[in-house]
C-alpha cells in the first residue's frame, strides 16, 4: 500500500509556506493504520527489540501497537512534569529555541535493545534527544523508525550512525 495516498496534505498550516502532513486521515483509516503498523513491525521484527520508545504524542499512536506486535514493552517519552516518580531529562535544540523531554529513571534497563518509533523525522532534534535519554538510561538504540521523513530538512544527517527507516518521504 502507498501510505502517501492516506496522508492528507494541508498547505498553509499552521502558517503560510508550510505544507502540513496530516496523519489523522491515515490513522482514521483501518486499512492504512494496519498497513503502517505492519510495515514498522516487518522492519523491526529481526532486530531483537526489548522496548519501543515513543515521544508524545504521536509516537504513542504508532509505538504501542508496534510494541504489542513485537512482544516488546513500551516506554513513553513526555514533556517535563507529566510523569510521576523519578525521571531523567534531556534538553534538545529546536529550530527556534530548545525543549526538554523525560522518561522514568527505571524504565530502561542496562543493555536493553530499543527502537524509537515516531510519526515524523524533520530536523532530527527531538529524536536525537530521545536517543540520548535511552543511552543515558543504559539502553542500546537499535533503530529509529518514522512514518514520515521530510528529506529537505536533513534530519537523517544529524543522526549519524543510527539505523534510520522512514515509511514515506516528502520534499518540504
UniProtKB/Swiss-Prot annotation:
Record localization: Cytoplasm
EC number(s) per entry: 2.4.2.7
Main localization, broad class: cytoplasm
SUPFAM superfamilies the UniProt entry points to: PRTase-like
Gene Ontology biological process terms in this record: adenine salvage; AMP salvage; purine ribonucleoside salvage
Gene Ontology MF terms in the entry: adenine binding; adenine phosphoribosyltransferase activity; AMP binding
CDD domains per UniProt: PRTases_typeI
Keywords for the protein's UniProt record, in alphabetical order: Cytoplasm, Glycosyltransferase, Purine salvage, Transferase
Pathway: Purine metabolism; AMP biosynthesis via salvage pathway; AMP from adenine: step 1/1
InterPro entries noted in UniProt: Ade_phspho_trans (IPR005764), PRibTrfase_dom (IPR000836), PRTase-like (IPR029057), UPRTase/APRTase (IPR050054)
Family per similarity comment: Belongs to the purine/pyrimidine phosphoribosyltransferase family.
Matches recorded under HAMAP family: Aden_phosphoribosyltr (MF_00004)
Descriptive protein name: Adenine phosphoribosyltransferase
Organism: Clostridium botulinum (strain Eklund 17B / Type B)
Gene, per the UniProt record: apt
